[in-house]
A protein has these predicted regions:
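Preference for the N-terminal adenyl/adenosyl cofactor-binding alpha/beta module
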Residues: 1-313, 339-349, 353, 375-438, ...
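Cysteine-dependent PTP/DSP-like catalytic domain, specifically the C-terminal lobe
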Residues: 323-348
């Protein structure tokens, strides 16, 4: 599927629909509009919604946006059904044998043909009058088609209310104009959503992501201005359609894996191209009595991509077990698949996508009774904000009960449009209050009917989120704490303190809670949690209490076309298996297609050369901070077990922070040599020298062994001026000033570079330094610039910062003192000569060019 035409259509459609719907709002709200006379109830509902959304221009813009996406969803849904023959006649499409032309239902109407199951006789008469000229109109065909489109929307509301919901009865008043024009949204929907494109319901998800892409750009532009994300921004900022091969990996290695563990003889494996067979034998897994028990939830389901592929896999499972094909779709929707979402638009599309999956497998799916359709509709729940007033709580909470506890339960969804499925209802309390509500529901009190209805909604949402499932699968929202508004930030601190740095971490914990204690979590998230210190608690939890079944590491460039970053997709068993090995697969940074090819190759060869590694929880726990460094060699892993941390071998320290470098620092050539002192060995000697300026090691560019001797600092009279500049200045570890050291820069875009400094330097907070005996420092300089240390620091220092906490964890073997000093002397001599060949070195004598010229 080529996404570019879909994106072009969807982004254009949003702008076009908002413009047209806004024009219709202005027209129907005009003082003398015919709609005010013919549809006063709908006009009142429209005016109420505009006022609720902020009134005036703000309210009208909000309603226009809502109605625009409502019609976009309906038009693409109808086009999808037209293309697949699920409608008796093309509702938005020309006849199947035509690419262009008027919608088939309009062409039929011109011939006097109407579907009696859809079109009300009165509407048929009005349409006929418009088309034969007996009813006056400035746009008879356009008005006739508008009436037909409204009728078909009402008809499909019976079987798909989530997609064809009656929004206060005014959406029909706001049907976009010019739908029959050559370049209308209908015409472009038909040419973009070809029959080939509509073979897979995945197209619906891509269209929605592209439809909101402009809004997403607005939100991210706001982040750059330090704006925060709340309920209105989270869907646009976090909605990403997952590439199909990642969906397949996650679902096949969770839903498929659990079935294969229960039925090792199953031929389901033949259709799972991304299935990774267990490396070690497994005995501790969820036992299933039948397919109905293979329940799946996606707690951030978006437009339903995970669930639609799970539908395909489950259909194959039911079929293999001998179930009748005609009953399988209903069984899957009733027993197996569940999704929650905070975005109404995405939730509607997810339910639609699952309905299309069912209809594709069961021709009679839409011909069932209304009760059957209601009972077997997709279990997609848009988690809605619900709050009760004090008098309503008086009604819901009987006297003698703990009001504070029960009030908290009833109002737990107050901010559900922000927190969504991260809300964790208590299962026992949910069951208890569900029984209590049944009694209240029998109370014949019209004044309380709304309260009871909302309470029932609370129970429904709580029941979905309080139960456990065989599999939880998700591509959850990614959002760092810096983008969260105060409400969400505080919620994360209170409820998910171990993972408050990013929403995706909270969803890992939530997925664990939603999975059965022997079930599986399949999830794709960012990869920063694998190594940085702030996620150490999450790593410890996963390694101590659970076990990885398989892991894909997608480095450098995200698989999502809109995001730069990196991703980790993994399947986690809720059962702990610390010694059990799992496959960890490292994929190329060269884009989606290359990553997919890498995965296929790794699954065939299962060798490290193709990125396939085996590791267990114990392997990671041997390394400080337990980073997920599955690619580590056995020798390097052993070094962490046997060696001493560098911080126990040498004294590692941070240095001086002047707080005003412009005032206290100079380049050495900017000051008088007479006021400078080089080579002091102590603070006492420096003070006695009477000098003002002393060599200052502030890190600097990448340079090994020797160099970056450029700056001097005002340390006259033992730093009196800097001391007086407190509390802004920070004078750390002054007892080590002027001592010989091994030093390195705090920041490097690649590997760290370590330099040997002689006596005479004060060092900065960005020129981290290690101290000890001269001989030890020589050996450490050799060790830290070695390939061994480079590899160790790739594990220990996952960011561009090489602070002393990370470097101090480098394991030092007992034989470090056996390193050859002569080698260091050669390296220092070469690096020193290179540094001193520049006129910016205080050791400069003459240019090497002079020597070259002299030889010639």
């Amino acid at each position: 599927m080529e996404p570019a035409p879909l994106k072009s259509f969807a982004t254009w459609a949003r702008t076009e629909l908002i413009t047209q719907v806004s024009a219709r709002i202005a027209a129907v709200l005009a003082p003398a509009s015919p709609e005010r006379t013919e549809n006063p109830r709908a006009i009142r509902a429209l005016e109420t919604d505009i006022a609720t959304a902020g009134g005036d221009a703000k309210g009208k813009d909000a309603v226009a946006d809502k109605v625009a996406y409502t019609w976009f969803n309906r038009i693409i849904a109808l086009r999808f059904m037209d293309a697949n023959g699920y409608t008796n006649a093309g509702v938005v499409s020309p006849p199947a044998d035509q690419i262009v032309g008027q919608p088939e239902v309009l062409a039929d109407a011109k011939r006097g043909t109407f579907d009696p199951d859809v079109v009300n006789p009165k509407i048929a008469k009005d349409v006929t009058g418009l088309l034969d000229g007996t009813r006056s109109s400035t746009d008879p065909q356009g008005e006739a088609y508008t009436l037909l489109l409204a009728e078909y929307s009402r008809y499909w509301n019976k079987s798909m209310p989530f997609m064809f919901k009656r929004e206060g009865d005014y959406t029909e008043l706001l049907i976009p104009s010019n739908l029959l024009a050559d370049e209308s949204i209908l015409a472009r929907a038909v040419t973009t959503m070809t029959s080939a494109v509509c073979e897979d319901v995945e197209v619906i998800g891509w269209l929605y992501q592209f439809y909101i892409s402009d809004r997403k750009d607005e939100v991210f532009a706001g982040f750059k201005k330090n704006k925060k994300a709340g309920a209105a921004e989270i869907p646009a900022a976090t909605q990403l359609f997952t590439p199909h091969w990642i969906v397949r990996y996650l679902v096949e290695n969770s839903v498929g894996r659990l079935w294969m563990l229960n039925h090792p003889e199953s031929r389901l494996v033949d259709r799972m191209d991304y299935y990774i067979a267990p490396a070690d034998e497994e005995t501790d897994f969820l036992k299933l009595a039948g397919p109905e028990e293979l329940t799946v939830i996606d707690p951030a389901c978006g437009s339903g991509h995970m669930l639609t592929y799970a539908f395909d896999l489950l259909y194959a499972i039911y079929e293999e077990e001998g179930y009748s094909p005609s009953e399988i779709p209903t069984l899957i929707l009733t027993h197996n698949l569940h999704g929650t979402e905070i975005d109404h638009r995405a939730g509607a599309l997810a339910a639609f996508a699952l309905t299309m999956k069912a209809r594709a497998r069961q021709r009679s799916f839409f011909t069932r009774s209304s009760n059957e359709l209601e009972q077997n509709k997709p279990s997609i729940c848009v988690i809605e904000p619900i709050v009760f007033r004090s008098d309503e709580l008086d009604f819901l909470i009987p006297a003698g009960r703990d009001r504070e506890v029960e009030a908290k339960f009833w109002n737990q969804f107050e901010h559900a449009d922000t927190f969504g499925s991260l809300i964790r209802p208590d299962a026992a309390q949910t069951a208890q209050l569900a029984e209590h509500l049944k009694a209240l529901n029998d109370v014949d009190d019209l004044l309380r009917s709304d309260t009871v209805a909302r309470a029932m909604r609370v129970i429904h949402q709580a029941q979905l989120l309080a139960r456990q499932y065989a599999v939880a699968v998700a591509n959850p929202p990614y959002m760092g704490s810096k983008q969260m508004n105060s409400l969400l930030s505080q919620f994360m601190k209170d409820e998910y303190s171990e993972t408050k740095q990013d929403l995706y971490g909270a969803f890992v914990m939530r997925g664990i809670g939603l999975a059965d204690r022997r079930g599986l979590l399949a999830i794709v998230i960012g990869d920063t949690w694998m190594s940085i210190k702030s996620f150490e608690a999450l790593r410890t939890r996963l390694l101590d209490c659970h076990s990885f079944d398989s892991f894909l590491h997608m480095r450098d460039v995200s698989n999502h076309p809109d995001i730069f970053g990196a991703n980790a997709a993994f399947v986690l068993s809720m059962a702990s298996g610390r010694q059990r090995r799992a496959p960890f697969i490292r994929l190329t940074p060269l884009g989606q297609e290359s990553k997919e090819q890498d995965l296929r190759a790794a699954l065939v060869t299962r060798t490290p050369d193709d990125g396939f590694h085996l590791a267990s929880s114990v392997d990671f726990e041997a390394i400080p901070g337990s980073p997920i460094v599955y690619w580590l060699s056995e020798k390097l892993r052993a070094a962490f077990s046997t060696g001493k941390p560098l911080s126990e071998v040498a004294t590692l320290r941070q240095g001086l922070a002047t707080a005003d470098n412009n005032r206290f620092l100079r380049q050495w050539w900017e000051v008088s040599r007479d006021r400078s002192a080089f080579g002091c060995t102590s603070r006492k000697e420096a003070k006695a020298s009477g000098a003002r300026w002393f060599p200052y090691n502030k890190g600097g560019e990448f340079r090994k062994w020797y160099g970056n001797h450029e700056h001097v600092v005002n340390w006259e009279n033992d730093g009196a001026e800097i001391v007086a500049f407190k509390p802004r200045s920070v004078i750390r570890n002054p007892g080590t000033y002027f001592s010989p050291s091994v030093s390195w820069s705090d920041i490097s875009s690649g590997e760290a570079a370590f330099r040997r400094y002689p006596s005479g330097f004060i060092y900065a907070n960005t020129g981290h330094s290690g101290f000890g005996e001269e001989e030890l420092l020589d050996r450490l300089a050799l060790l830290l610039n070695s390939t061994y240390a480079i590899q160790a620091l790739r594990v220990l220092a996952p960011t561009m910062h090489f602070d002393i906490g990370y470097v101090g964890l480098v394991p030092v073997a007992p034989g470090v003192r056996d390193f050859p000093e002569e080698r260091l002397a050669d390296l220092m001599r070469t690096a020193g000569a290179d540094w001193d060949s520049s006129e910016t070195s205080w050791g400069f004598e003459r240019s090497p060019l002079v020597e070259i010229a002299a030889r010639h």
